[in-house]
C-alpha cells in the first residue's frame, strides 16, 4: 500500500472520529460532571432560560421538574436567576462535600462586584449530576442592586 493511500486512510479515520455534538431534546437531564452541571445552570441563568435551568436543578432523585410543582419550581428558578445573573464566571475548584455531594466553587462577577460562591451538586439517576443547592448569601447583592455598575441594561 502506498504512503499516499495510508495517509488518506488515516485522514479519513481522524475525520470520522472527530468531536461529536450531543443534542439534548429535553429528555436528557442533569450533566455528565458536577462542574458541567454548574456551567449549564449558570449559562441558563444568563439566557433567562427557566426550562434549561430546570434540566440541571434537582436532587439524587433526578430533576426537580419531576418532583416539584411546576409553578413552585418556576418561582424558585426565577428568584435564583436574579441572584446568580452575572457578567462572567470562573470555576475555582471542586471538592468532595458531605452526603455524596460535590462542591463546585465559582467566582461570579457582575458590574464592579466580584463574589465567590459554592454550588452543591449531587449525582442522580443514570449517573447524571444536578445542582441541588447553592450559597445564595454570597451573591445577595447581585439581585436588584443598582450599585453593580450596570447601567442601561
Task: Locate predicted features.
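Short solvent-exposed beta->alpha transition segments
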Residues: 27-29, 35-40, 47-101, 109-112
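Bacterial N-terminal signal peptides that target proteins for export
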Residues: 1-7
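Short, charge-rich, low-complexity alpha-helical interaction segments
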Residues: 17-21
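C-terminal motif of bacterial Sec signal peptides marking the signal peptidase cleavage site
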Residues: 13-14
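Alpha-helical interaction segments
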Residues: 5, 30-32, 43, 73, ...
Amino acid at each position: 500500500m502506498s504512503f499516499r493511500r495510508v495517509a488518506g486512510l488515516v485522514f479519513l479515520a481522524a475525520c470520522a472520529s472527530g468531536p461529536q455534538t450531543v443534542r439534548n431534546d429535553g429528555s436528557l437531564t442533569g450533566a455528565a460532571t458536577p462542574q458541567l452541571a454548574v456551567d449549564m445552570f449558570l449559562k441558563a441563568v444568563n439566557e433567562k432560560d427557566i426550562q434549561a435551568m430546570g434540566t440541571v436543578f434537582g436532587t439524587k432523585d433526578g430533576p426537580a421538574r419531576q418532583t416539584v410543582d411546576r409553578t413552585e419550581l418556576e418561582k424558585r428558578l426565577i428568584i435564583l436567576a436574579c441572584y446568580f445573573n452575572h457578567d462572567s464566571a470562573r470555576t475555582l475548584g471542586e471538592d468532595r462535600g458531605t452526603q455524596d455531594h460535590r462542591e463546585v466553587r465559582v467566582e461570579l462577577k457582575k458590574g464592579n462586584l466580584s463574589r465567590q460562591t459554592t454550588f452543591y451538586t449531587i449525582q442522580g439517576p443514570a449517573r447524571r449530576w444536578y445542582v441541588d443547592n447553592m450559597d445564595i448569601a454570597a451573591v445577595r447583592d447581585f439581585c436588584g442592586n443598582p450599585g453593580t455598575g450596570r447601567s442601561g441594561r
